[in-house]
A protein has these predicted regions:
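Bacterial N-terminal signal peptides that target proteins for export
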Residues: 1-7
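Bacterial N-terminal signal peptides
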Residues: 8-16
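Sec/Tat signal peptide C-region and signal peptidase I cleavage site
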Residues: 17-21
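Subset of outer-membrane beta-barrel
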Residues: 22-323
């Protein structure tokens, strides 16, 4: 029975890893925790504050070697038009892991007066990633297993665009635009094409009201498999003294999955911005016909806004920090 559970765990982890972690940084719901830059490079330096963010995510609580992800990111505007940013991440899933560094250059074009929000942005991210497979603890005899830690490094790039007009915001990102030949995994299952396309649309309103609302949708498409996903999101803000309380709810739905499993995710998020600091908690529940574990996914995000400038006349919280 234990061997059957081990095999199921390895196969589940392997399919999850090949399906996502080879595509550099995995895409979850971090962007709803005031961390849009993790998903869209055009958000680098886009607002009136520099932003430092740390996230820690764990899956399948109580399961040994379950997937986990940690990120450290920062970005800020330099001068009037240039944004710079970086991301460090560590992604582990059972015997598989990857560590990466991403650096971003963004250019922001103001289409109206400097104190208004009417801005077009372009960005390019370059990244270096090291993938590894730890075979040293494998207990299943197989002549093709070397029982060492095998690793391989490669490079990739993301391109992004964004447009903001007062409370309206939109992003487009093409991820992993370079084709990479790698020998770490079986070429029958590992494609050169890791491209993924993302579009985010949203609107922030109620700035003068007791509550502010931010509905948004993020759509994803994977070029190689034809998979399509959409996140339907609602975020609510409320200012209390020197703090801003907020909560978000996200529903990720898969469409036309080209023969893959129909997996959907429900994600509630709660957070608070106090002066220049931010903390949030994210819980994700997976739904579908086949589930490895019912424990869900947990994430903590911490943030610090630095070198803040005067806010512009109107804009979403990603443009104008709370304090």
């Amino acid at each position: 029975m234990k061997n059957i559970q081990l095999i199921i765990f390895v196969l589940t982890g392997l399919s999850s890893f090949l399906g996502r972690s080879q595509e550099t940084l995995p895409i979850y719901s971090d962007y709803l925790s005031d961390n849009v830059y993790l998903v869209h490079p055009a958000a680098a330096g886009i607002g009136n504050c520099g932003k430092l963010r740390v996230t820690a995510r764990s899956q399948w609580s109580g399961v040994n070697d379950a997937p986990s992800l940690q990120t450290l990111s920062a970005h800020n505007r330099i001068g009037d038009n240039i944004g710079l940013g970086f991301i460090l991440f560590n992604d582990k899933n059972g015997y598989h892991s990857q560590q990466g560094f991403q650096g971003t250059f963004a250019y922001h074009i103001n289409l109206s007066r400097p104190d208004d929000v009417n801005q077009l942005s372009f960005a390019l991210s370059l990244m270096a990633v090291n993938n590894s497979v730890d075979e040293s603890t494998f207990v299943i005899p197989d002549p093709v297993i070397s029982q060492i830690v095998r690793s391989e490094s490669y490079f990739n790039a993301d391109f992004g665009m964004a447009y903001h007009n007062k409370g309206f915001f939109s992003y487009f990102t093409a991820k992993n635009i370079m084709l990479n030949a790698r020998s770490l995994y079986n070429s029958k299952f590992e494609s050169l094409n890791l491209r993924r396309y993302l579009i985010t649309l949203g609107y922030y309103f109620g700035e003068s009201k007791n509550l502010q609302f931010e509905p948004s949708v993020m759509m994803q498409a994977i070029e190689r498999t034809g998979e399509k996903f959409a996140d339907f999101n609602m975020k609510v803000y409320k200012k209390v003294a020197n703090a801003q309380l907020w909560a978000a709810f996200s529903y990720r739905k898969s469409f036309d999955n080209a023969g893959t499993l129909d997996l959907n995710y429900i994600t509630p998020i709660i957070g608070v911005n106090y002066k220049n600091y931010m903390v949030s908690y994210t819980y994700t529940k997976q739904t579908g016909d086949i589930l490895f574990d019912d424990a869900g996914y947990h994430q903590i995000s911490l943030g610090w806004n630095f070198l803040c400038k005067a806010p512009r006349s109107s804009g979403c919280p990603n443009i104008n920090a709370s304090f």
